[in-house]
Structures are given as structure tokens and as C-alpha cells.
């Protein structure tokens, strides 16, 4: 049984002498006052700075370029060896933070993946997943897409939903573009029902507390966890301006560090991720939503609402700053030590100023003492050393070929045309027939140089991490894990050499999704005025954030399905054991 935890920071040698068996912890525990009259933790602000490595945080603090983050570190625990989910894609990365689980339990491998049971959508998606038939009561098999392509109009900030121009949410999702469940009347599978486990949002909402989140796509209302309905009802206020929509001017709007967004569309003809400044304007929309929540408003600031018990957002600016090459100007890093280029440093400075706006709002509302701030990242980015970047096939098309090209004859049609596989610095391969796995592995070995092969996971090397690939013995309604094969586990995972990215683009120099250290070692900072600053060097995982949040709020971490299944502990150093 999980031990209880409590506030454990004691002042004075006298108390320590009287209680020698108690370990000195770094800060506040569950939501109750201790003898030192500390504020109870009533709110948790969770921030994912997508792409933010542990070394990025260390470097910006050392160079005095992120004063807000440095200040939070003065009242916080810093974890230097934090690893994300594997794969390190945004979808499983976010799920780790809110479920406490890995793809093995949660069932989320990538935003574009495959399910051997589900059926294709009723309409083509905006990114090219072709519609198909759904045969009731029969195993079908389809790629799964939970990104911008399932929106009504992904070119618009509001996703084409019934919102004002700069609003956005789940009503932008077109159910005709969602995969369907042949064992549930061929009904669409909404993203929050696609995942198999509950989330902190479900637990906190069930406890009668207000919840909110903001992210880059409407489908990331998946943080709700399963509801069995067409609504992610565990999230009381969800805000998702579409990051891959076309850049438009935002009149009278400025970022935290003063960038005017009134004429931002002059910078690019692309989406918000194609320009170093545009992405700041995009992220600022979400920053303003967080500030509105702190002020007791809804995300637009147009109505009163409770201050959420759990709330937060993801930043895209650092991730874009790491990858982007714009008109010959490179983001990323100047060396293998992670020293940022000026463009990359500007993205970190913007994020720092934005978090500063949140901290200022918490102070103004007298909420800082009662709020735990957790700052981490869904994923990192690889390679940090851009000299190691090697695109396959590259812009010329002559640098080699991705694994999907080598195995094209063994893959479902949807993987080689239309939407295609999501091959970044990883390749996950679902074969048409799993019995061809040995043949496929031999083909990859024979073409190892062409694919930049580092490691192949299949068979036992795969099933030590994930459930065995296959189909259930007795299939049933989505999305429970059933006896037999796992319909979502790839047959093969290719981990390329460090620096290899499967792309032909000339506008990127890194990616994420893989298992490399640069992909997975992200910053993790837990801050509150009552926490004594400390750096923890033991290995931890971002999945430990989920049970830690519940512990902060005085709720049972074992209420999370994935925590019970995987034994995910709370983060070390924060809570004091009762030593019963």
C-alpha cells in the first residue's frame, strides 16, 4: 500500500533532535496546514515547455537569461536526470504527465500511429488519412490520427469551430474524421476515449474541483481521460488555438517581452511554427488564458470562474526555436554543450517572461503560497549538436531512405501514401502481417547504412518495454486492453543513429519522438515558496508528475489507473513519510 505523505520541513535543531527518525523533506505535502502555518496547496500550475532540455535550464540560469525560472528554482526542487515517455512524441509525452503511465498502459504511442482493430474515418482527414469502410463486429485496422488533421478547418486558429477568431476548443473536431470502433456501432473514437486510463483531470474533477488546460490542438483535450461521451467533461475549461493554422495578425496584441503581433503575418506565409516571432504571438494567446484563470476568469477573460485546482499550458516557442531554419537563420545550438543561438535564446527569454506574467498574477491574487508550480516538458529535441544532424532522405533525396521506404511492400497502404507514417528521429512500423517481422528485420539490417540504423527493437527487446503486438483473443469495444495481442504496439521500432532525422525538409535541424538522451532528458522544476531549494540527481520520469500533483492536492495517487498498474511513485524529496 502506498505510504501517506505530509509536510516535512522542520525548522530548528530542537525539533530535529526530538524527531530523529523523520527525514527532512524539501517542502509542502498534501493540502493541510502544518504546525508552521504554511499555506495549504490548493492549486497546481503545470507548464510544459516543449523541447526544454535539462541543459537548457542549466545554461539559461548560469547565463542569467531566464530570471523567472531562476527565481522559481530558488524555492524549488530541480531534477537534472528527468526522462520523458518513450516514444518522446507530444501525445505520449502529455499522457505521461497526466496519467502517470507509459504507452504500455495508456495505449498512446504517437499522434499518428496504428490500431489493428479500429476502422478508418468516414471522411478524409486534412492531413491525408483516407476514409474507408467500417465493418461492424469485425477487426478492421487503420492508422490513427490525433492532430490538426481531424479539425473542421485546420487553417484557422479556431479550427473551423463555432468560436470567435482567436478562440478554439473541442467543437473544432470533425467526428467524421475520427477513427471508428467496429465493436461499438462504428461510432467515432474521440481522443479522450482513445486512451485507456484515467487522468489527474478525471480524479480532480470527480473531487468537485475546477480544472483547466490549454494546448496546441483541440484533440489534446485528451487530458480529460475517458468519459464515454463526445465531451471531455473532466476539463471544465479547455482552450486550444490551432498551432498549425495560418498565421494571422492579432491587432493590439503584444507578447510578454513586447513583440507587437499586429502585423505578424508579414513574417511568413506558413503556420505559426514557421517563424521565430510568430510562435511567440501564438503562445501568448495561451499565456493570457492562464493569467485569466489565475484572476478567476474563463480563458477569454469574459466571465467569472473558479481558480482551477489544476491548470496550465504547453509552450511551443522553444521547440520551434530548436528546430527551425528560417531564411538562412538557424535556431538550435552553437555547440554540443547546448549553448543557444541568438534565435533560440530569444525563444527561451520569451517563455521566461511569459511565466513571469503568471507568477506576477499569482502574487497579485495572493495565490502564490497556495500554488505548486511544476515546469517540465513533454519531450526534448535531438540532436543538440547540430553538426550531428543528418536528414534522411534529405532535400536532395540522396542521403538514404527511411525504414518505411525499405519495407513499403510489407506495410498497409495507408502507411506509404496519403498521411504516411510519422517518422521523425524514430520509425515505428506496423506490418500488414506480423508474421513478416523476421523478413522485415532482415531487410532493415541489409539496408542499415541507408536508414542510418542504430538499433532495432522487435520480439523480446520490444516486449520488455511494451505489450506484445497483435490483436486481442476476443475483441470488444474500444478502448480496453484485452487478453491476447496489443493492437497498438508496433511490430518493429527503428532507433536511428543520434542525429538522424527522417525528413526531406530544409527548414528543420532536429526533431523529437525517439529514445535518445537529447529527446528524453528534459527540465523538471517543482516550486513553491515553502520549498527549500535543492537539486536531485537521481533518475526520475515525467510520469511521476501525475501522482505528485494528486499528492499536493490531498488526493490519492493510487486513484490513477496507470499508477496502480505501473507502480509510478511520487517525485522524491517533496513529501515526508509517516513511517507508520
Predicted regions and their residues:
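Active-site-proximal N-terminal segment of extracellular/periplasmic enzymes that hydrolyze or transfer
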Residues: 27-77
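Short, structured active-site-proximal loop/turn typified by the sulfatase FGly-forming signature C/S-X-P-X-R
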Residues: 57-110, 210-212
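Non-catalytic, well-ordered alpha-helical segments in soluble enzyme domains
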Residues: 70, 425-467, 528-530, 538-565, ...
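Short, solvent-exposed turn/loop segments enriched in Gly/Ser/Thr/Pro and often Arg
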Residues: 79-98, 214-224, 314-316, 563-570
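Acidic, His- and aromatic-enriched active-site or binding-groove loops in soluble protein domains
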Residues: 99-112, 212, 228-293, 335-352, ...
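Active-site His/acidic residue clusters
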Residues: 218, 222-234, 297-350, 387-389
